[in-house]
Regions:
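Extended, intrinsically disordered, low-complexity segments
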Residues: 320-361
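A charged helix-plus-loop insertion that forms the helical arch/lid used to bind
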Residues: 100-119, 164-166
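N-terminal hydrophobic targeting/anchoring segments and the immediately downstream early-domain regions
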Residues: 21-84, 90-100, 359-361
Length: 361
């Protein structure tokens, strides 16, 4: 049927354009300062071509504004598939709030339900992520930094706390898998975090660099286990945590030993590895040094969140193009996002309400 041929040509042309554009991207994910791009931000993004973007509550006010912001970001880099990330976990970490999206329960609430009824907990975790995919997808946001696979221990800093699915590796892995599956069923990319485990940290990495002195055997048994179980996920985010049994000098994010020996080999993760936010105080040095250290250690992407233009310029100055195996991992990650569940939104919300509706506002 000859009328199909032009469509094939167009599809091939678009695919070549996207692949070429991605190959010209820099290995970084950046935020912006406000609810629309300034001229300086737009000019900077066009010139530096970040692979992806991340948005926070400060960037989000109403539906049309969010659509316009996300479209402007993608327009700057010339890639309609440029991923836009967000932290939309539920509980206290939720960038979209009413009326843009409901207030959802925390991971700990899912864990409590799982403790009473495993099947119900798993289904609720899947449903919550499927609803996240609906909420985010309608604004053009395509990646959610979820599931949290950290296993907190008694006495650890509360930065993880009720963001965790439980206090055993088995429960965290099971609910994390359900959450990741729910996102992917809705066409969103999941990002497991904070590899290889943030649950023992005695400090909030937004403010300080924690050191974990636990033995390698205990880390392997508990902390690494959920990440090992979900090592097939497309994207992971590192922890700004020192594990003295592995590398007593460098946090995982800038430790070649942790990334190569633990994340890549021990855990078996061969997907796209992004840093946690490079503007956190857990990291030291100027921002160009941070970017270089992150990439030299083996991360595929540098994440910078706060939208500070001077910091972003310094990050970009030492960030190399996304190429080689990192580019292939990025392509695989984007290709893994495909809407497969077509259940009506009202039905999904009604079913979730049967489990944890009293905790949704």
């Amino acid at each position: 049927m000859p009328w199909k041929q032009p469509h094939r040509v167009v599809r091939r042309s678009v695919l070549r354009y996207i692949l070429r554009a991605m190959s010209e991207s820099k290995a970084m994910i950046l935020g912006c300062a406000g609810r629309s791009l300034t001229r300086d931000e737009a000019r900077f993004y066009r010139g530096e071509a970040p692979w992806g973007f991340i948005v926070f509550s400060r960037n989000l006010s109403e539906p049309e504004q969010i659509h316009d912001l996300v479209a402007a970001m993608r327009d700057c880099v010339g890639r309609p598939d440029a991923p836009v990330f967000i932290d939309q976990e539920g509980g206290r970490v939720q960038r979209l709030r009413p009326p843009l999206a409901p207030n959802y329960p925390s991971a700990a609430a899912l864990g409590a339900l799982y403790g009473d009824d495993k099947a119900a907990g798993l289904r609720a975790a899947w449903l919550l992520s499927r609803l996240h995919a609906i909420d985010l997808g309608r604004y053009g946001i395509t990646a959610n930094c979820l599931p949290v696979l950290d296993v907190p221990v008694e006495g650890a800093n509360d930065v993880i706390g009720n963001r965790a699915y439980g206090r055993t590796a088995t429960q965290v892995a099971a609910l994390g898998r359900a959450a990741a599956d729910g996102l992917m069923a809705g066409g969103l990319l999941p990002v497991m975090k904070h590899v290889p485990g943030h649950g023992r940290a005695q400090a909030d990495t937004h403010l300080a660099l924690p050191t974990v002195d636990t033995s390698l055997a205990d880390l392997q048994r508990q902390d690494f286990a959920p990440f090992r179980e979900l090592a097939d996920l497309p994207i992971a985010m590192t922890a700004h945590v020192i594990y003295s049994a592995i590398d007593p000098r460098n946090p995982a994010t800038t430790s070649g030993k942790v990334i190569e020996e633990i994340i890549r080999r021990e855990i078996g993760f061969d997907g796209l590895l992004m840093s946690d936010d490079s503007s956190m105080k857990a990291l030291s040095g100027d921002f160009s040094m941070r970017a270089a250290a992150i990439l030299d250690a083996g991360c595929d992407l540098v994440l910078h969140c706060n939208g500070d233009m001077d910091e972003m310029r310094a990050i970009a100055a030492r960030t190399r193009p996304l190429e080689g195996v990192a580019l292939e991992r990025a392509r695989r990650a984007l290709a893994s996002a495909s809407l497969s569940d077509h259940t009506k939104e009202d039905d999904l919300r009604a079913e979730f309400a049967d489990y944890l509706g009293a905790l949704v506002a």
